[in-house]
Design a protein with these regions (language model features):
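Active-site neighborhood of phospho(di)ester-bond hydrolases with catalytic His/Asp-centered motifs
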Residues: 51-54, 79-85, 107-114, 177-179, ...
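Membrane-penetrating hydrophobic segments
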Residues: 1-12
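Core catalytic region of metal-dependent phosphoesterases/phosphodiesterases
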Residues: 64-185
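Beta-strand-turn-beta hairpins that frame and shape the catalytic cleft
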Residues: 39-51, 174-175, 181-193, 219, ...
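Acidic/histidine-rich helix-loop elements
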Residues: 47-66, 86-89, 118-132, 157, ...
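Conserved beta-sheet core of the metallophosphoesterase superfamily
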Residues: 227-321, 328
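Short beta-strand/loop segments at the ligand-binding rim of alpha/beta enzyme cores
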Residues: 212-223
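N-terminal active-site segment of His-dependent metallophosphoesterases
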Residues: 8, 15-99, 119
Length: 328
C-alpha cells in the first residue's frame, strides 16, 4: 500500500474522529434560540409570544445548559409551554426548579414525557434506525385518573420522582395539561389548551379531553410530548389551531442537505423539527398541500438527550420563541 493510500486512510480516520468529537462535545452544548412567527390568531388579535421548551433531560451537573436556559427568562415571554422529558436523573428536580426559576414566574403549561416517569438507560444508538421506533413503547396501561403508571415506588431505581416534579411545577402556577383541558388569559388573549399524557408510552387518553374547540376563545392549542399521528389527527380534527410537541430531538443526527433520518415516532422526518402544517390524515403529505384550515404544528428539537447517547450533528439543541400573530 503506497503513501497516498495511507495518507487518505489517515485523513479519513482523522475526519471521522473530529466529527465524532464535535457531535459529542461541541454541538450538544451549542444551544440555539429559534424565533418563529406563527399566523394562527384571529384578525384583530394582538400578537403573543410563547416560549417552547422541550426535552431538557436534565442532570444537575449540566452547568452550561442550566445557565443558558436561565437566561431565557430575559426574553419575557407571555407564556411558556414545556412539552416534557425534563429529567435524566432522580436528583434533578431541585436543579430543574432552579434552572427554570425566572420562567416559573411567567404563565406556563406542561405535559409529561417518558423521561419524567422513567430514568434513561443505555441503548444502542443504531436501534433508533429500525422501524420499531415508529411505534409506541408498551410499558403497561396507564392508571385511570393518575399520571402514567401512578405513584413511583421510592425503591425502584428505574422510576423518576414524578410527583415531586408535578408539585414543583404546579406549585409555581404552571398548568398541568396531562390528559387535561385548561383556559388561560395571556396578553389579553383567551387561550384554550388541550393536552395528553405521553403517547410514546401509550399513556395518552384523548377521550378524556376530546371535544370541539371552544367558540369563545381566540385560539385552541394542542400540547403533547410525542407527536404521534393519532394524537395530532384528533386534536386538529377538534379544531386546535396550533399543535406543540417535542420528543423527536429533531432526529438528533441530521444529514446536511437532507435532514433527519428518524423521529422516534410515526411522524414523517420532514416534520422532525420546526414549523409545518397538520390536518387529519396528513400523514407524509407536504405542508405545501395543506388545506386552508390546517393547524400549525411546531416540533422542538429539544435542549438535551439521553445522557448515554448525547450525540448531535447538524441539529443543535434549541428553545423556540413562537410569536403568534393574526392569520394572513
Amino acid at each position: 500500500m503506497d503513501r497516498r493510500v495511507w495518507g487518505a486512510l489517515g485523513t479519513g480516520a482523522g475526519l471521522a474522529a473530529a466529527g465524532a468529537a464535535y457531535a459529542t462535545w461541541v454541538e450538544p452544548r451549542w444551544f440555539a434560540l429559534r424565533r418563529v412567527e406563527v399566523p394562527c390568531l384571529p384578525s384583530r388579535a394582538t400578537s403573543v409570544r410563547v416560549l417552547h421548551l422541550s426535552d431538557l433531560h436534565l442532570v444537575p451537573r449540566q452547568r452550561v445548559k442550566r445557565a443558558w436556559v436561565r437566561r431565557l427568562a430575559d426574553l419575557r415571554p407571555d407564556l411558556v409551554v414545556d412539552t416534557g422529558d425534563n429529567l435524566a436523573a432522580r436528583d434533578a428536580v431541585p436543579a430543574l426548579v432552579d434552572t427554570l426559576d425566572g420562567l416559573l414566574d411567567v404563565p406556563g403549561a406542561f405535559v409529561l414525557g417518558s423521561n419524567d416517569y422513567f430514568a434513561p438507560g443505555l441503548k444502542n444508538p443504531l436501534r433508533y434506525l429500525d422501524d420499531s421506533h415508529d411505534r409506541p413503547v408498551r410499558t403497561g396501561a396507564a392508571t385511570p385518573g393518575q399520571h402514567g403508571p401512578g405513584p413511583a415506588d421510592p425503591t425502584d431505581r428505574g422510576r423518576l420522582p414524578t410527583e415531586e416534579l408535578l408539585e414543583a411545577l404546579t406549585g409555581r402556577g404552571w398548568v398541568d395539561l396531562t390528559n387535561a383541558r385548561a383556559r388561560l388569559e395571556v396578553a389579553g388573549l383567551r387561550l384554550e389548551l388541550v393536552g395528553v399524557d405521553d403517547p410514546h408510552l401509550e399513556y395518552d387518553d384523548y377521550g378524556v379531553v376530546a371535544g370541539p374547540a371552544a367558540d369563545d376563545v381566540d385560539l385552541t392549542i394542542g400540547v403533547t410530548h410525542a407527536p404521534y399521528r393519532r394524537v395530532l389527527d384528533a386534536m386538529s380534527r377538534d379544531g386546535a389551531g396550533l399543535l406543540i410537541a417535542g420528543h423527536t430531538h429533531g432526529g438528533q443526527l441530521q444529514v446536511p442537505g437532507y435532514g433527519a433520518l428518524v423521529t422516534n415516532c410515526d411522524l414523517d422526518t420532514a416534520r422532525a423539527s420546526g414549523l409545518s402544517r397538520w390536518w387529519p390524515g396528513a400523514g407524509s403529505t407536504p405542508s405545501a398541500e395543506a388545506p386552508d384550515d390546517a393547524a400549525w404544528l411546531h416540533v422542538s428539537a429539544g435542549l438535551g438527550g439521553n445522557p448515554y447517547t448525547p450525540f448531535r450533528f447538524s441539529c443543535r439543541p434549541e428553545a423556540t420563541l413562537l410569536t403568534l400573530v393574526p392569520a394572513r
